[in-house]
């Protein structure tokens, strides 16, 4: 279950960031409309992926996903935009991952 949870979060994050990036390129950098259309379709996939999570609460899934998204966004900025994260970016991302673990795996009655 843990591996599926992680893979779904990673897939959703890449879909959200990748789709948003294509829309960004279309609107901000004058790329062809196909970029925007592809980005919109990928963003639809992003909306569907979290429904496959086994956790029953929408809010809990999206709150935990938010932490994963932050880490992926820092990595995207580093690898795609070539903007090297500083120490505080990494510390913040690590804190977010701790939050994800608390939200998803804390014992509940």
From Swiss-Prot:
Query: Which region is the signal sequence?
Result: none
Look up the record and report any one GO term of the cellular component aspect: plasma membrane
Q: Which residue spans adopt a coiled-coil conformation according to this UniProt entry?
A: none
Transmembrane segments in this chain: where?
Answer: 6-26, 32-52, 61-81, 87-107
Fetch the SUPFAM superfamilies from UniProt.
Multidrug resistance efflux transporter EmrE (SSF103481)
Which topology term describes how it sits in the membrane? Multi-pass membrane protein
Keywords linked to the UniProt accession: Cell membrane, Membrane, Transmembrane, Transmembrane helix
Where it sits in the cell: the answer is: Cell membrane
Classify the main location: membrane
State the InterPro entries in the record.
UPF0060
* Sequence similarity: Belongs to the UPF0060 family.
Q: What is this protein called?
A: UPF0060 membrane protein YfjF
Organism encoding this protein? Bacillus subtilis (strain 168)
Which classification does the entry list for the species?
A: Bacteria, Bacillati, Bacillota, Bacilli, Bacillales
């Amino acid at each position: 279950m843990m591996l599926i949870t992680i893979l779904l979060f990673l897939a959703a994050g890449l879909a959200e960031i990748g789709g948003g990036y294509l829309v960004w390129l279309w609107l901000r950098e004058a790329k062809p409309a196909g970029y925007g259309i592809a980005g919109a379709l990928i963003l639809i996939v992003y909306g569907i992926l979290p429904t496959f999570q086994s956790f029953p609460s929408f809010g809990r899934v999206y709150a935990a996903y938010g932490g994963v998204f932050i880490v992926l966004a820092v990595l995207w900025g580093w690898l795609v935009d070539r903007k090297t994260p500083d120490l505080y970016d990494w510390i913040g991302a690590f804190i977010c991952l701790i939050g994800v673990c608390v939200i998803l795996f804390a014992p509940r009655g």
